[in-house]
Amino acid sequence: MTIGIAAHGPNAGLAVYRSLRATERVGAGSIGGFASFGAISADGKLMRYETQRGGTSTLFIEGEITGTDPPPDVATAASAAVISSGPDRPQPEKLLAADTLAGLVTGHRMPMTTGADGISVNQQVLNLMKGGHSAQDAVDAVLDRNPEVDAGLVAVDRSGQVYGRNSARVLRRPDIAEARASRAGASVIVFYNSIRPHTVLAALATEIALDIMLGLPKPDGQVKVNAGTPVIPGRERAVYCDANNVAIHVTGHDFELVSGQGHCTGIDLGSPVYKGSKLIGHTMFETKIIFRDGKLAFVSDQKSVSFGYRRALAELTCP
């Protein structure tokens, strides 16, 4: 088995699916064949799906349509995992261990290999999590006892911890890759081998999963910038608003912007937004402007534009 992905967070089911799909589309090698997918909803429902050929293009079906996104209850699941490789793997249900009370165990190489205790190593991890061990404690305990097993294991427990580790044997391979990311309550781990280009795809897969789970940040407020707004000299590109969040002037440090005329980026992404002397946030939008003699003539080819800002972490006063 060449790739294992596990995630916990909002829409983890969709995140794991899209992460695998992106890897199939960009990568080459032993991928796009069988897939065994599992997800656990917030209320503890286990949902499993399998395919032997086609990977994500046949994993989920809606009527006569293949290659669809997971159904809503799967897409919104809080924990999800998948293991995938080339086509036609025997007993795919044994390659991803799952239990509603414990969590999910995926991985790459041969996670169903029987370990020193006479039980497959992925099932050993699941059994330990059933007994109350965290994902990290369970994976470490099993791989400490089985350093030469041909497996990398990735587990997500019911508390939401996602943890992965390769055995000493797998770490000696020249073609393995992994990536881990955790941000704002969302976590994902990707392990794989035998997929090219093997040094870069893992990071892509994790970022795609995180992007699905975290989504686009929502603005804390809106700023309105109208044509005719003055541009005055300042050491930064910034927007200064009145009590109604309408721009009263924009600052810039470019001589041409203040005194000439032309076309340029006027308000940068992440520009400070002030209400009076108080920093209230940073812009989530970038505008292009046409300016004439120190005033905005057009903002993103319009006479008036509203865009969002994210709230500042601390209240500051402008210099």
Short names for language-model regions:
Residues M1-P319:
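N-terminal nucleophile
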